[in-house]
């Protein structure tokens, strides 16, 4: 007898090259597939190396988007019932976006000593270093 699998409850999708095409947009075909999944009760969760502030509005506007995994998995956000307003109320002074506030459900912080060691290694190799803090990416200019 064939093995029965549980119903899919969540689909996590990387942004660049997966959810977004080469031009940085969601295709109509992808949008239709996401809508079909949402109609079956599946959570669609963007997962990205980007900080929350860099989530494209087009992604936040997709049907069924409520949760987002950011910073390469270091933070999980609940955007509530108004994802666009949640993301942009946090990072914008525009009054029209102040409809809700994102809630950080989980964040994994690097110990300070480990961060210092990583910074020293990157500096010695002249490597780019990005630090994510409070939903923003910080770089040494």
Predicted feature locations:
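Preference for short coil/turn "hinge" residues that link or interrupt alpha-helices
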Residues: 1, 12-13, 19, 58, ...
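Mg2+-dependent phosphoryl-transfer enzymes with acidic/Ser/Thr/Gly-rich catalytic loops
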Residues: 2-10, 26-28, 39
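Asp-based phosphoryl-transfer active-site loop
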Residues: 9-23, 118
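Active-site phosphate-binding/coordination module
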Residues: 28-93, 98-141
């Amino acid at each position: 007898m064939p093995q029965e699998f549980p119903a899919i409850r969540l689909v996590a999708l990387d942004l660049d090259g997966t959810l977004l095409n080469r031009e940085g947009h969601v295709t109509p075909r992808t949008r239709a597939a996401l809508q079909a999944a949402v109609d079956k009760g599946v959570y669609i969760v963007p997962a990205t190396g980007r900080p929350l502030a860099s989530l494209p509005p087009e992604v936040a506007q997709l049907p069924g988007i409520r949760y987002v995994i950011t910073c390469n998995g270091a933070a999980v956000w609940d955007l509530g019932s108004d994802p666009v307003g949640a993301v942009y109320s946090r990072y914008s002074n525009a009054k029209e976006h102040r409809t809700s506030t994102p809630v950080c459900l989980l964040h994994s912080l690097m110990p300070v000593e480990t961060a210092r060691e990583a910074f020293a290694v990157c500096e010695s190799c002249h490597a780019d270093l990005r630090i994510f803090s409070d939903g923003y990416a910080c770089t040494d200019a």
